[in-house]
């Protein structure tokens, strides 16, 4: 059966503290996650074709702490940094941060106060994370280089996990919803982005897990001639608990299909400290 918020166990940190689980008062959860997306194919207007390589690097820091012993509410802050290069530049050029006109941009792009709570007390491993993203970008695109959205975003992420009785398998599900407020100069003005996902993990040992996942991305515009897109993403990865406080994760994913989107792949590494 699934593990509730109030139930103690001898499981490892990576087994017990999924994104569905809230922190107790005085606990801290700090996650540094890095995503490198690179593409050489895209599908727009119903046509799939080769394109010059574009690469988008996103680095986020999420900090949360608990406010009560009953794990009823967590508060946090999300920070996002981006570095993008286009026009056939090498994927690793995102780490040069050279700001070359017409091919590169980088900078801190947004921050977001956030809360995390459990709306149904009888289901302790179902939680919602709400965040209000405040943009630090004036222009989404400069010299043909996109950096990030310049509009406000209200994000809600719905988390649920289920641990199978043998303890070796765990299913984690998420629905990420992002409403982009009306902003005339934003490509996603007055739109809703939905990203459901399912992650199946196998634990050969309590401190190590391998996983596979599937996600779908759907951007729905409420404008008469707004931009819309969709994509299906398949991926795999692993997590390892380095110490009682620190774990590392590696993920790979591939955009296997889509409409009006790039068909690239992502390489991800994250570090999470919980104390």
Model region roles, listed by residue range:
Residues 3-180, 193-274:
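Transmembrane beta-barrel domains of Gram-negative outer membranes and organellar outer membranes
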């Amino acid at each position: 059966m699934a593990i509730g918020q109030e139930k103690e166990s001898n499981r490892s940190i990576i087994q017990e503290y999924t994104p569905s689980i809230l922190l107790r008062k005085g606990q801290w959860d700090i996650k540094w996650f890095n995503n490198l997306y690179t593409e050489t194919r895209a599908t727009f207007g119903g046509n799939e074709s080769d394109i010059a390589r574009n690469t988008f690097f996103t680095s986020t820091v999420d900090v949360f702490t608990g406010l009560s012993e009953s794990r009823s509410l967590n508060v946090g802050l999300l920070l996002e940094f981006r570095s993008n290069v286009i026009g056939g530049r090498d994927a690793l050029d995102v780490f040069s941060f050279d700001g070359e006109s017409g091919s590169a941009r980088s900078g801190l792009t947004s921050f977001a106060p956030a809360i995390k709570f459990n709306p149904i007390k009888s289901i302790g491993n179902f939680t919602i994370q709400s965040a209000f993203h405040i943009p630090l970008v004036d222009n989404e695109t400069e010299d043909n280089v996109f950096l990030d959205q310049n509009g406000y975003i209200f994000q809600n992420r719905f988390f649920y996990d289920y641990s199978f009785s043998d303890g070796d398998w765990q299913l984690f599900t998420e629905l990420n919803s992002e409403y982009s407020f009306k902003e005339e100069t934003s490509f996603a003005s007055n739109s809703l982005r939905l990203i459901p996902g399912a992650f199946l993990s196998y634990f050969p040992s309590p401190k190590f897990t391998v996983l596979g996942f599937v996600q779908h991305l759907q951007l729905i515009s409420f404008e008469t001639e707004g931009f819309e897109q969709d994509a299906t993403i398949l991926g795999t990865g692993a997590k390892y608990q380095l110490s009682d406080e620190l774990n590392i994760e590696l993920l790979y994913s591939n955009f296997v299909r889509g409409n009006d989107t790039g068909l690239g792949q992502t390489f991800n590494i994250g570090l999470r400290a919980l104390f």
